[in-house]
């Protein structure tokens, strides 16, 4: 019977945050949870060995943390500690498998791959049949109130009072004013200018560059398609049918195409609003390099920050802008975080997202190819406080019930118990 769960911290901040959110629920379910610190491997390794009980322990991780032959869990000639103690390894891959082709090898015997998008799951099962595909588990959200209860965020009231003191305002009225949403539109996420990708497009020769540009142009013209759908069609047309082991390497070498189209549409969404005179607060790196901005005074720059601070900023926003990172049958945590913290999420749709949240249930959908409609949709939301609040209310009821990290932990705990019983 599984009673103990190992998780990872000290790597990518957002992944550590997701892990701690899930750990809260795992502990509520009766599991003992140990966090292995990737920044303190020497001290963590000894504690990890004391924590492990063979056949009672599993690893739950994101993005192959703890599965990259880290010194504390892997030794040359011996292998992974996970294999030594017969530990199942559940890895939630927070992006497409083609980003991880170089990591999808030499993995522990009991590796279990979890996909956050149903089409990504299908791709993994076709191109990596040597590994177990455990299922589809989309990303989830956290409400700031939940973070407050867990001691991870300053209470809303305290933030409001602090702001009132800093600005010289006193009393309940000043605090209430500061607590009201102060960002009309916000986007939390980084931006990379498109010229950054030119060396990758041109890295072989002109013939390959033309091939890559054809794929990019096809994706920009047909944004409902996945990168693999378009890229594989072009590969077959140019080179004929190739074995999957060759194609998966080819797709891995084209990940810059995925990043190009993500940033193209993310930049276009922000630019469209800013050029329409709508102020947009962007939280993350790279936005000072956004091209073709006609109203720079409407582009409000904020530095990249941690997860809890982002949640606080969402709680202070009316509208949260999202462009899906090419998840065509999954969801991004930005969508759920926005709704849980009181902002309407204006986003492009995905098949899964439209099943879970209908129009007006926390979200307003704008197809990428209909970007010209974005300013009017956002203006309508900003001008209708009661309507906007009703959209959030309807969405929050659904998200609180189905799309928190606690719910994801419960699903994963059921899978772990099911696997252990076999």
Which residues are covered by each model-predicted region?
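A structural micro-motif
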Residues: 3, 31, 57, 87, ...
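Catalytic binding pocket for nucleotide-activated donors in carbohydrate/polymer assembly enzymes
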Residues: 7-11, 17-29, 34-41, 106-108, ...
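A short, gly/pro- and small-residue-rich
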Residues: 73-90, 200-213, 334-343
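Short, hydrophobic beta-strand segments that form beta-sheet elements in well-ordered domains
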Residues: 35-37, 90-92, 112-116, 136-137, ...
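Residue-identity detector for glycine
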Residues: 151, 162, 168-174
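Extended catalytic core of nucleotide-activated donor transferases of GT-like folds
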Residues: 4-8, 15-126, 143-148, 152, ...
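Nucleotide-sugar donor-binding catalytic core of glycosyltransferases
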Residues: 2, 9-18, 128-157, 174-328, ...
